[in-house]
Each structure stands twice: as structure tokens, then as C-alpha cells.
Amino acid sequence: MSNTVGQIIKCRAAVAWEAGKPLVIEEVEVAPPQAGEVRLKILFTSLCHTDVYFWEAKGQTPLFPRIFGHEAGGIVESVGEGVTHLKPGDHALPVFTGECGECPHCKSEESNMCDLLRINTDRGVMLNDNKSRFSIKGQPVHHFVGTSTFSEYTVVHAGCVAKINPDAPLDKVCILSCGICTGLGATINVAKPKPGSSVAIFGLGAVGLAAAEGARISGASRIIGVDLVSSRFELAKKFGVNEFVNPKEHDKPVQQVIAEMTNGGVDRAVECTGSIQAMISAFECVHDGWGVAVLVGVPSKDDAFKTHPMNFLNERTLKGTFYGNYKPRTDLPNVVEKYMKGELELEKFITHTVPFSEINKAFDYMLKGESIRCIIKMEE
């Protein structure tokens, strides 16, 4: 790869030219990394619901043409000036949020919300010069959340790149770049269930299943899945879920159903849907005195919810989390090691694999609700 250092690389990328239209495989030019940046050769990427959301232009600022993708694994091709923690040949995971290492958030043991590199879905350019590193015949193509992994090569801020064990299979650990860590960490790092405890998981999509996996790893004995789609329950058993509640099948609030099932409430609840009603239910279903509810799902812009202050005064705790409270550069390598040691199971999240030329199939699988994670293999 060294003969490309400092040069423009021509490669294939899946370009979204307009909202909701199939991606088109195009030849793009990828500029070399500037100071503080890294150019990665992407080997495997996967589709996350966030990609679909912004591809459908439901986000704040639709930007097209754009190269989506933010869950991926690859190899460092070259680094820009001042980058010291990475070198060509390193195996790495790009992440939609970063760790500059210098801001108050990065210096705090409690936060992963870097001031400089926190997720920005509206920005389609690099921080350095407010320009794109992608172009087609001279026309700039927008970046997406600083990663744009639906390209054989991409340029990412060095603070958003985690160096990982080179023995880790990139076609498996690539899914740790977003959704799996978001759910897993919400349980392990934020809810912190004790062995033998009870945990309710609201929403059994990819993030909710990852939250359930976190409860399984933590040793929870009762893992209650809550979802409006009963067909999801069978699959969820693979992730440690051993009891199920469909709110539509009851004539009382689901928090009351769960409280009755658990002699007053669960020890922990993790909400992974973004639904206001689910947030209220998750908080109100935890036991007084010690119960902790964690919000993961992203609500709509103008949403608000109310609950009685006595729920707090009775010693219930409500927390929020972002990317599972993991610092990307510091913590992600350790999550990869959890997988390498057999503590974390990733294979069960991967339901489909497609070649890069058939990337639109991944969108079809997700839109039909058929996939948890679809791996897109860049080299064919």
C-alpha cells in the first residue's frame, strides 16, 4: 500500500445521489489525509439503521451526493502529519464519534462525549479545512458522520480511529463501530446489573439485542424482552432473553405488567426504541430503592415525557447514554478482546453477507426487517 502514500487514490464507492434512491457504485478520487487524519482501506462494512435514516433524508439536513457507512473494519493505508498512535498496516475500526484526548470530556473518566469529535450528522466535510476528501470528476461528494465507509478507501479524523488486535477478524468486529457497542455498553457500563439480577430490555432490534447480550455477560438471571412484534422473541433467546412481554397483549400499562411479574419491578431496564411511551415504561418498571433505567433510543426532535416526581423520590434512577459510554480509542480495543476471549458473541448478530456490488440488497434486508446486521464485503 506504501506506493499510494501522498497520492490521490481512485477506487469504488457506493454513492447516494438523492434521498431514498439506490446507491450507485462509482469511481471516486480519495485525497491523501491531511494533518491529524488517517486514510483507511476498508475491507468490511455493515449497514446500520442510522445510515438508512439519513439516506431516506429523515435527518435534519439532507446532503447529497453522499457516501454513507459508519460501521467498518479496515487497514491504515497512510497517516497525516502529527498522527502518532497509528501507522500504515495497523488494523483499525473507524467510529462515528471520537476521542481527541485533550478536552474535558476526554479527560473525564465518566464521559465519552468528546467536545471536538462528537457525532455531527449535518457536517459533510472534514474538520481541518471544511472540504471533502472525496470527488467524482472534480465534484465534491459529502462525507457522513466523519467515516463514509461505503468506499474502498476513506479519510477519517485520527481521533475517530481505534487501533485493534490484528488477529481479530474484521468481518466480525466491524459491527462494533456503532450499534452493538451502543447496546452492550448501555447495559454493562451504565445500567451495571449485578449477577442474578433482573433486566428488562425495551425494543429487540440490533441495539436491544446487544443490550440483552450485555445483560447475559453480566450474569443477569431474568432478562425480559419487551417488543410490539412477537416474532422477534424467538431470535432474542439467542441473546439471553428468557421472558417476553408484548404490550399489545395486555390491558394494563406494561410497567404494571412487569412490576407484577417481578415482585415490584426489575432491577434494571434499558430502553432501545426512542419511543416516549417506552421511555416512561422503562423508568416506571424499575424497582423502588435501587432500580436503574437507562435511555438509549433517540427520540423525535420535539418529544418530551412526564413522570411523577415521586418515582425519583422513591429512589429510582434514570440515566442516559451515548455509544454505550465507550471511549472509542481507549475502550474499543478492549471490547474486541472480549470477543477474542469468547466472552462476547458477535456471529449471532450477523444475519447476511453481500458483495460490495450488491450493497443495495443490504438496504432491502433492513427495510423488510429481515436482518440484524448485513456484512458488506469490499473485495470481491
Curated annotation (Swiss-Prot):
SUPFAM superfamilies: GroES-like (SSF50129), NAD(P)-binding Rossmann-fold domains (SSF51735). PROSITE patterns: ADH_ZINC. Its EC number is 1.1.1.1. It is found in: Cytoplasm. An alcohol binds at residues 50, 70. Binds 2 Zn(2+) ions per subunit. GO terms for biological process: formaldehyde catabolic process. Zn(2+) 2 binds at residues 100, 103, 106, 114. It comes from the Eukaryota. One of its GO terms (molecular function) is alcohol dehydrogenase (NAD+) activity. Zn(2+) 1 binds at residues 48, 50, 70, 178. It is an enzyme of class 1 (oxidoreductase). It catalyses: a primary alcohol + NAD(+) = an aldehyde + NADH + H(+); a secondary alcohol + NAD(+) = a ketone + NADH + H(+). Keywords: Cytoplasm, Metal-binding, NAD, Oxidoreductase, Zinc. Gene3D superfamilies: Medium-chain alcohol dehydrogenases, catalytic domain, NAD(P)-binding Rossmann-like Domain. One of its GO terms (cellular component) is cytosol. Pfam families: ADH_N, ADH_zinc_N. InterPro entries: ADH-like_C, ADH-like_N, ADH_Zn_CS, GroES-like_sf, NAD(P)-bd_dom_sf. Its cofactor is Zn(2+). NAD(+) binds at residues 50, 203-208, 227, 232, 273, 296-298, 373. Homodimer. PANTHER family: ALCOHOL DEHYDROGENASE (PTHR43880), ALCOHOL DEHYDROGENASE CLASS-P (PTHR43880:SF26). Belongs to the zinc-containing alcohol dehydrogenase family. This is Alcohol dehydrogenase 1. It comes from Pisum sativum (Garden pea).
